[in-house]
From Swiss-Prot:
It comes from Arabidopsis thaliana (Mouse-ear cress). The KASH domain, which contains a transmembrane domain, mediates the nuclear envelope targeting and is involved in the binding to the SUN proteins. InterPro entries: ARM-like (IPR011989), ARM-type_fold (IPR016024), TORTIFOLIA1/SINE1-2 (IPR033337). Keywords: Immunity, Innate immunity, Membrane, Nucleus, Transmembrane, Transmembrane helix. Residues 306-332, 411-442, 465-487 are annotated as: Disordered. It is found in: Nucleus membrane. Disruption phenotype: No visible phenotype. More susceptible to the oomycete pathogen H.arabidopsidis (Hpa) infection. One of its GO terms (molecular function) is microtubule binding. Residues 17-290 are annotated as: ARMADILLO-type fold. Interacts with SUN1 and SUN2. The gene is SINE2. This is Protein SINE2. One of its GO terms (biological process) is antifungal innate immune response.
Length: 554
């Protein structure tokens, strides 16, 4: 039976190199032979197919595709014959002369054996052995065939199809590490043809990121070198694959494994912003990915100059190039952040009242110094900038401390002047109430507690009865102009005074209203009594007239 199979098989193989009609007939007959094979004859067919040494270039891909059909038809029964099939595939790749059709046929055969040669009920050790039998010859071909580029490219393509298979998860960590090691050496040694190698790197970084992290820097350097080769050779497809490989590594691997290469990737991607459209879009996406990873590792990274920023950020800005305001002060010497939100109310309390400008306040006293520091202090309230001269970067905290002391002294002097002007126009009782108000005055807002508000109201009621000179309203009802230097806490007292006057008018009208209400109630009660009496009278005297007459029998 094996002899008859061998003769028919060789005859059909010979017909593959003939005219197209004979070729189609031969392939149909060969596939029929594969499907009709008995399980006991599979090893004979595999041995005869593997022993074919002289296969034409055109028929090589079709011959290897029979292994794919054999795996689909017989499943796990092909697993014991993988050690015989793989040398035939390696030999076919060596003689393919770079034919993409033959390489794709070999990759499909490897993927089919990995998929159908392992059953879900297969023990884990047997699954690992099957993957090892498929992977080991291909991994060795990446290194041993550096002088044979066709074999290396075909092996890389077959390995990619194997890695993308679902059963690749059964591969041991040692096997994955050997593949990564061979791939790193092959990428370093290859000069021009490396597209299949870069595709294999992307597949491994997707399925085995933890193992690839040990070789991440080598892959990045190889990718950048291949990117430069793509520029020299004018190969846009090679540039695109190299950029995609770098992007895959940054997306799937731990950023710490390639942290030292991120800035280099960013700088290289900037060179391809004017390349062809699809290359430019891939470079832009990769550059944004690199920038995001760099910013996560170094928040002070400057994307414009691609270096860490040396200037202070926040309300203290460099005069050479003012950065965007980020709400914090950063000191380079002690590398500590100082939040400037706490300094707003103290440093710019005079600005909040609207009566003091920053340039005219005693806060700016640095003009007499001769040294120039190179930073300005920006007002967060009105946007003015205060030039600070003669202050070193390391003494920025002391500057804030002196500014806070000066602002507190300035506030005390302003409050004392307003209190003195108020005391000259008020009597003793008004001065006491003004002191209570000034005690709770801050930034021009009155903050009187409820009890003090009641005391002020009672005092104003007494003032309205005893002295008319203390009221700011004239008898004609018009208001007198007040001095502009009076404190803002007088405004609530004027409202209280007007309320007190309204209350006195209401108290004068209360007796009249009470008497009128009493008379109205008395009239209504008398009227109701009269109506009730009239109704009872009419009911008593008209009842007899309303009764019908009684009939008396005669």
């Amino acid at each position: 039976m094996g002899r008859n199979l061998g003769s028919a098989f060789r005859q059909e193989l010979a017909n593959l190199d003939k005219d197209p009609d004979s070729h189609k007939t031969a392939m149909s007959n060969l596939r029929s032979i594969v499907k009709d094979l008995d399980a006991k004859v599979v090893h004979v067919f595999v041995a005869q197919l593997s022993d074919v040494k002289e296969i034409g270039l055109e028929s090589g891909g079709y011959t290897v595709s029979l292994f794919e059909d054999l795996a689909r038809a017989h499943g796990v029964k092909i697993a014991p014959h993988i050690d015989i099939i793989m040398p035939a595939i390696i030999r076919t790749l060596s003689s393919s002369e770079g034919s993409l059709r033959v390489q794709q046929a070999c990759s499909r055969a490897v993927a089919a054996m990995a998929r159908y040669g392992i059953d879900p009920t297969t023990p884990e050790d047997k699954k690992t052995n099957v993957i090892h039998s498929l992977c080991k010859p291909l991994s060795d071909s990446l290194i041993d065939s550096q002088h044979q580029q066709h074999l290396a490219l075909g092996s890389a393509l077959c390995l990619k199809s194997l890695v993308d298979c679902d059963n690749w998860r059964s591969a041991s960590s040692e096997m994955v590490n050997n593949v990564c090691q061979s791939l790193a050496v092959a990428l370093e040694a290859t000069s021009s043809e490396a597209k299949s190698h870069m595709a294999l790197v992307m597949a491994l970084s997707k399925h085995n990121p933890f193992t690839v992290e040990a070789y991440a820097r080598l892959f990045v350097k190889s990718g950048l070198r291949i990117l430069d080769l793509g520029v020299v050779e004018g190969d846009s497809q090679k540039r695109l694959l190299a950029i995609q490989m770098l992007n895959f590594l940054m997306k799937n691997l731990n950023p710490k494994s390639i942290s030292s290469e991120l800035e280099l990737i960013y700088q290289e991607m900037e060179k391809y912003q004017k390349d062809q459209h699809y290359v430019k879009m891939a470079a832009h996406e990769t550059m944004r990915q690199a920038e995001r990873l760099i910013c996560e590792a170094d928040p002070m990274f400057d994307a414009e100059n691609c270096k860490p920023r040396n200037s202070l950020s926040g309300s203290v800005k460099s005069t050479s190039s003012l950065r965007e305001h980020d709400g914090s002060v950063y000191s380079r010497q002690d590398r500590s952040y100082v939040n400037d939100q706490d300094e707003y109310d103290v440093l710019f309390s005079g600005v909040a009242s609207g009566r003091t400008l920053v340039s005219g306040s005693p806060l700016v006293t640095f003009g007499d110094n001769n040294q120039e520091t190179g930073f300005v202090i920006e007002s967060p309230r009105i946007g003015d900038q205060i030039q600070c001269s003669g202050v070193e970067n390391g003494n920025i905290e002391s500057v804030w401390f002196h500014q806070r002391n000066r602002s507190s002294e300035f506030n005390e002097s302003v409050c004392s002047r307003t209190n003195r002007s108020r005391s000259s126009r008020r009597n003793t009782k008004k001065r006491q109430s003004g002191d209570i108000c000034s005690k709770h005055h801050r930034h021009g807002f009155a903050q009187d507690p409820f009890t003090e508000l009641l005391d002020n109201r009672q005092q104003l009621l007494q003032y309205s009865e005893t002295s008319s000179s203390s009221s700011i309203y004239d008898t004609s009802g018009t208001t007198t102009p007040t001095n502009t230097t009076e404190d803002i806490c007088e405004k609530p007292k004027t409202d209280l005074d007007s309320e007190a006057k309204l209350k006195t008018v209401e108290t004068e009208l209360d007796p009249r209203l009470g008497r009128s209400k009493g008379v109205l109630k008395l009239g209504l009660s008398v009227f109701s009594i009269a109506v009730a009496g009239f109704a009872s009278f009419m009911w008593m005297y008209l009842q007899d007239d309303m009764m019908p007459p009684h009939l008396v029998p005669t």
